[in-house]
A protein has these predicted regions:
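Short, Lys/Arg-enriched N-terminal segments with co-localized hydrophobic residues
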Residues: 1-13
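A short Gly-Trp-Pro
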Residues: 15-152
Length: 152
């Protein structure tokens, strides 16, 4: 990020939000809330962001925290927007998910805790990682537009 796009997002540590689930439920559309705060998953192939090819930034749909740059996006063939690296390591957090037979690693927005998706070790170089994101969990901001302010 450069210029005004960078100003409000980088600093010493991530300011975590402490909103309740009820507050998020009132602030978000039901489908977004389900994915972000009930750890739901959207149907594969349902997100228009799969076909998003413009330069820009993918931000958390709950709090506007910048999570991914378009330069790290790739077509994984899975039906979900996929990235091989986050915009900044401290903008996401991971935890083990035991909902299926085999454990997986899920990742969340480090600021609001909103569930984004799962990370796998089958991505392209240079990281070998695939951040498989729910499209409803992020919003795309084209490079020529200012990023929206962070939501408190």
């Amino acid at each position: 990020l450069s210029g005004s796009r960078k100003r409000d997002y980088w600093g010493p540590g991530m300011n975590k939000l402490s909103k309740t689930k009820d507050a998020w439920r009132r602030a978000l559309e039901p489908d977004r809330y389900n994915i972000l705060f009930e750890e739901g998953t959207e149907r594969a192939g349902s997100s228009p962001l799969n076909d998003e090819k413009r330069d820009g930034t993918f931000i958390c749909a709950a709090c506007n925290n910048p999570l991914f740059d378009s330069s790290g996006k790739f077509d994984s063939g899975t039906g979900w927007p996929s990235f091989f690296r986050p915009l900044a390591e401290d903008h996401i957090e991971t935890k083990r998910d035991f909902k299926l037979i085999l454990p997986r690693t899920e990742y969340h927005c480090a600021r609001c805790g909103g569930h984004q998706g799962h990370v796998f070790n089958d991505g392209p170089a240079p990281t070998g990682l695939r951040y498989c994101n729910n499209g409803l969990a992020v919003r795309f901001v084209p490079r020529d537009e200012d990023l929206p302010p962070l939501i408190d």
